[in-house]
A protein has these predicted regions:
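Short loop/turn segments at strand-loop or loop-helix junctions that form parts
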Residues: 2-6, 65-71, 150-154
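Glycine-rich phosphate-binding loop and adjoining beta1-alpha1-beta2 segment
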Residues: 2-33
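Catalytic loop of short-chain dehydrogenase/reductase
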Residues: 8-12, 86-188, 194-214
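"Short basic amphipathic alpha-helical interaction patches in structured regions
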Residues: 13-15, 51, 78-83
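A glycine-rich helix->loop->beta "capping" turn
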Residues: 32, 49-78
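Conserved beta-strand segments of alpha/beta enzyme cores
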Residues: 33-35, 189-191
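Conserved NAD(P)H cofactor-binding loop of Rossmann-fold oxidoreductase domains
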Residues: 39-41, 66-81, 87-108
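The beta1-alpha1 cofactor-binding region of Rossmann-like NAD(H)/NADP(H)-dependent oxidoreductases
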Residues: 39-50, 126
Length: 214
């Protein structure tokens, strides 16, 4: 599942659209199943479409990888929350790599309000992950020994103020808590994979972190 902009005839598609289309093409050429659903993974409509696709093409699945980086999320009750990339406690200043002109300068990150932290947890935390797993479980499209994994990152102390101790860190902590809830309440083994830092479209948007990763 992706949420990417296709070409409209006047503008090219987003990079992610081409990457995913190429992956699907190469997989099919090798005889490996791959199908892309383009839409808002937070929405009930995409969840339902995914369930129907699994039923039609695969029957059941034994692994679900949950990896979403998004600026906003509309919850089932219709409320839209927006995530922020800020520190918590007090303002944080450090060197930053500006990818627009490849220059290095100082960057100050303001401290988030309590409401901004809560909103970021709503978007980037584990609530939607749990909704996904419950929906898949209820639809009987998970194999008996199915498991699910979500990704997290800790990083070095240099990145703590903006990541581990920042708003996105609060969301990742919620993700860890949700893994236990999914395992106990949904009945699906849920794991968190803590990985190294990678330069991606999502990670490049985090202030200060790109300089550390480079």
């Amino acid at each position: 599942i992706m949420f990417e902009r296709p070409s409209n005839g006047r503008k090219t598609a987003s990079p992610g659209w081409y990457n995913t289309a190429s992956f699907e093409q190469f997989a099919n050429e090798e005889g490996v199943y791959a199908k892309t659903i383009n839409g808002d993974a937070f929405s009930k409509e995409i969840k339902n479409l995914t369930i129907e696709t699994i039923k039609k093409d695969l029957g059941k699945v034994d692994l679900v990888v949950y990896s979403l980086a998004a600026p906003r999320r509309t919850t089932p009750d219709g409320v839209t929350y927006r995530s922020v990339l800020k520190t918590t406690g007090e303002e944080f200043t450090n060197k930053n790599l500006n990818l627009k002109d490849n220059s290095i300068g100082m960057k100050s990150i303001p401290a988030a309000t309590e409401e901004e932290v809560e909103a970021t947890v709503k978007v980037m935390g584990g609530e939607d992950w749990k909704l996904w797993m419950q929906a898949l479980k209820d639809a009987d499209v998970l194999s008996e020994d199915a498991s699910t994994v979500a990704y997290s990152y800790i990083g070095s102390e240099l990145t703590y103020p903006i990541y581990f101790e920042g708003t996105i860190g609060a969301a990742k902590k919620h993700l860890h808590q949700t893994a236990d809830e999914i395992t106990k309440e949904v009945g699906v083994k849920a794991l968190i994979s803590v990985n190294k830092g990678l330069v991606t479209q999502a990670s490049a948007a985090i202030p200060i972190v790109p300089l550390y990763m480079s």
